[in-house]
């Protein structure tokens, strides 16, 4: 016992020293600015900090590639599918078409005897359509429904403690005695909905799968996640490959689709290699039920800065699994399609909310770095502090008073994006990933300021993405973007003022013209390819019935 405690202390000290040393090393490399390659007049340079970031991308991609190879090799052996599984669907003001497609995909799941529990966040007349769709698709004679005036933590109007206890027991009994059931309950947020399903199921099943009501599951999705959990008893949770259902509806949803592929099949695949996936996404995840009930109350009652948390439910659920020392994995063999915002403002609000949960959960995550591979500490430091270094770099370049610095920055952003997307195209075997380089512009212009705004308002939970039946537009997300653009515009004006006071040399003019032409040609080429792709694939997908998950 004392030996284990001593080893734990050593691991805590070791991971802390590693993390601090890594951060100090990166900061020193950034401040010193040592250059390996440097041309006359500083038209091009490549330094220590740039070399470190390039090495990170290469190493991350290598481990992702190795994890994909491991998925193909280790999971070919069939296993017995004799464990019980329950699928929990969280629904809130869902678009009727998406909900119907979700439930139709649930009926096609190939895992034997899977139990389906859908909990609707809201019990008003406006929410009844979701229950009607559930009964229609799942079969009125094969499913049960119940309108609950309460939820497990709040009483409805006119309820007493005794009647609330009785109704809670009734809901639990309904869930346990029916293979398919839909419950409408008093509004309380997604975490409340998930808690109802977890609490009512109790320990009656071996594995619990989570799913959102806008998600279409591949028939084999449950089977493939069970395989991962069955293969290693120390894996506590597993997530699958989330793809975009409405990718051709707008430029935002299209860029999100390529970003999703990169996030899951490069970043999370790399994390999976070391058993430390930091977020099992809500649309497609599975957990060991025995673990779930070790922390479900702590998960529900999570507080941050004195307030109960109302977002970041899936990330904190993953964090709780990691806190127990269990591994979290990703499998590309389990797939689903899910909806993503098609309007810029709704996307921005979604990203800000996700960024809030990321930075909040980063702090929780740091408490159990010592329980996992050093890669978990390494990646948390890199991804957590990268936005700050990037903002410092952008402001520095824009306010140096040299127009070439601004142009070089724009070219570098696209070049790095193009290199990364080219590798992804090879790994995926699909040229569409080349558009990932366009996402870098969206990241620099919108996501970067959204991350800073998320930190500044991390304890504010009053807004985010809305239900899909009624889209609510929130303009608050434009505040950080407007401030960011004002800062950049100030740098451009300052640069123009400084450059106007000194004549351009012939070599400088040549470099600027060549750089501008390269940048313009890049955009013309990518935008042309985008128009061609949308015209070709968008029409083909329009009105198509999704019988299975497609990777297009």
UniProtKB/Swiss-Prot annotation:
The pathway noted for it is: Glycan biosynthesis; hyaluronan biosynthesis
Extracellular side stretches: 33-45, 396-402, 451-475, 532-552
> What post-translational modification does the entry describe?
Phosphorylation at Thr-328 is essential for hyaluronan synthase activity. Phosphorylation at Thr-110 is required for transport from ER to Golgi.
Q: List the disulfide bonds.
A: none
Where does the entry say this protein is expressed, by tissue? Expressed in fibroblasts.
The reactions it catalyses are: [hyaluronan](n) + UDP-N-acetyl-alpha-D-glucosamine = N-acetyl-beta-D-glucosaminyl-(1->4)-[hyaluronan](n) + UDP + H(+); N-acetyl-beta-D-glucosaminyl-(1->4)-[hyaluronan](n) + UDP-alpha-D-glucuronate = [hyaluronan](n+1) + UDP + H(+)
Q: What induces it?
A: During cell cycle progression is induced at the G1-S and G2-M transitions. Up-regulated in a panel of cancer cell lines.
The first-level EC class reads: transferase
In the record, the effect of residue 221 to E is given as: Increases protein degradation. Abolishes hyaluronan synthase activity. Does not affect subcellular location
Q: What GO terms describe the biological role, i.e. biological process, of this protein?
A: atrioventricular canal development; bone morphogenesis; cellular response to fluid shear stress; cellular response to interleukin-1; cellular response to platelet-derived growth factor stimulus; cellular response to tumor necrosis factor; endocardial cushion to mesenchymal transition; estrous cycle
Annotated localization: Cell membrane; Endoplasmic reticulum membrane; Vesicle; Golgi apparatus membrane
> How is this protein's activity controlled?
Regulated by several post-translational modifications such as ubiquitination/deubiquitination, phosphorylation and O-GlcNAcylation. The enzymatic activity depends on the availability of UDP-GlcUA and UDP-GlcNAc.
| Ranges that cross the membrane | 12-32, 46-66, 375-395, 403-423, 430-450, 476-496, 511-531
Keywords from the UniProt entry? Cell membrane, Chromosomal rearrangement, Endoplasmic reticulum, Glycoprotein, Glycosyltransferase, Golgi apparatus, Isopeptide bond, Lysosome, Membrane, Phosphoprotein, Transferase, Transmembrane, Transmembrane helix, Ubl conjugation
What is known to happen upon mutating residue 221 to D? Increases protein degradation. Abolishes hyaluronan synthase activity. Does not affect subcellular location
Q: What EC number(s) does its UniProt record assign?
A: 2.4.1.212
Major subcellular site: membrane
**Gene3D superfamilies under this entry?**
Spore Coat Polysaccharide Biosynthesis Protein SpsA, Chain A
Do the record's keywords include Membrane?
yes
> Phosphothreonine modification sites?
110, 328
Binding partners and assembly: Homodimer; dimerization promotes enzymatic activity. Forms heterodimer with HAS3. Forms heterodimer with HAS1.
What is the protein's known function? Catalyzes the addition of GlcNAc or GlcUA monosaccharides to the nascent hyaluronan polymer. Therefore, it is essential to hyaluronan synthesis a major component of most extracellular matrices that has a structural role in tissues architectures and regulates cell adhesion, migration and differentiation. This is one of three isoenzymes responsible for cellular hyaluronan synthesis and it is particularly responsible for the synthesis of high molecular mass hyaluronan.
Q: What is this protein identified as?
A: Hyaluronan synthase 2
This protein's species is Homo sapiens
């Amino acid at each position: 016992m004392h030996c284990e405690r001593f080893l734990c202390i050593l691991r805590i000290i070791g991971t802390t020293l590693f993390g601090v040393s890594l951060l100090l090393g990166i900061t020193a490399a950034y401040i010193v600015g040592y250059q390996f390659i440097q041309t006359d007049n500083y038209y091009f340079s490549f330094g220590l900090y740039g070399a470190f970031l390039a090495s990170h991308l290469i190493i991350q991609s290598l481990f992702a590639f190795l994890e994909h190879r491991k998925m193909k090799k280790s999971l070919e052996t069939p296993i017995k599918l004799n464990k019980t599984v329950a699928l929990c669907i969280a629904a809130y003001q869902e678009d009727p078409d998406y909900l119907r497609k979700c439930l139709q995909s649930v009926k096609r799941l190939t895992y034997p005897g899977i139990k389906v529990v859908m909990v609707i966040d809201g019990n008003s007349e406006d929410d009844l359509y979701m229950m009607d769709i559930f009964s229609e698709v799942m079969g009125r004679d094969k499913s049960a429904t119940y309108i609950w005036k309460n939820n497990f933590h709040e009483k409805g109007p006119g309820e007493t403690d005794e009647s609330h206890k009785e109704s809670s027991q009734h809901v639990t009994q309904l869930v346990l005695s029916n293979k398919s059931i839909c419950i409408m309950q008093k509004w309380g947020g997604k975490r409340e909905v998930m808690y109802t399903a977890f609490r009512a199921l109790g320990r009656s099943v071996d594995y619990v799968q989570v799913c959102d009501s806008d998600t279409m599951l591949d028939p084999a999705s449950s089977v493939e996640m069970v395989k991962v959990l069955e293969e290693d008893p120390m894996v506590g949770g597993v997530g699958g490959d989330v793809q975009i259902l409405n990718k051709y509806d707008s430029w935002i949803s299209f860029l999100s689709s390529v970003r999703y592929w990169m996030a899951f099949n490069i970043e999370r695949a790399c994390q999976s290699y070391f058993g430390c996936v930091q977020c099992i996404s809500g649309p497609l995840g599975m957990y060991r039920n025995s673990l779930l009930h070790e922390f479900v109350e702590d998960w529900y009652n999570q507080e941050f800065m004195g307030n109960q948390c109302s977002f970041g439910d899936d990330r904190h659920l993953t964090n709780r699994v990691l806190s127990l020392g269990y591994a979290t994995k990703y499998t590309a063999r389990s797939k689903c399609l899910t909806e993503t915002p098609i309007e810029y403002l709704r996307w921005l609000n979604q990203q800000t909310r996700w960024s809030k949960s990321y930075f909040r959960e980063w702090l929780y995550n740091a408490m159990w770095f010592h329980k996992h591979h050093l890669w978990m500490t390494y990646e948390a430091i890199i991804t957590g502090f990268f936005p700050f270094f990037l903002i410092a770099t952008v402001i520095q370049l824009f306010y140096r008073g040299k127009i070439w610095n601004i142009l070089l920055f724009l070219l570098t952003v696209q070049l790095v994006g193009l290199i990364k997307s080219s590798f992804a195209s090879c790994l995926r075997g699909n040229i569409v990933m080349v558009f990932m380089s366009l996402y870098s512009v969206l990241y620099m212009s919108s996501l970067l300021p959204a991350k800073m705004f998320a930190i500044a308002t991390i304890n504010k939970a009053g807004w985010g993405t809305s239900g899909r039946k009624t889209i609510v537009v929130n303009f608050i997300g434009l505040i950080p973007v407007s401030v960011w653009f004002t800062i950049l515009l100030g740098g451009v004006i300052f640069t123009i003022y400084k450059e106007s006071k000194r004549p351009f040399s012939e070599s400088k003019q040549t470099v600027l013209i060549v750089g501008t032409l390269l940048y313009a040609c890049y955009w013309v080429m990518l935008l042309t390819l985008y128009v061609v792709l949308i015209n070709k694939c968008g029409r083909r997908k329009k009105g198509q019935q999704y019988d299975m998950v497609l990777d297009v």
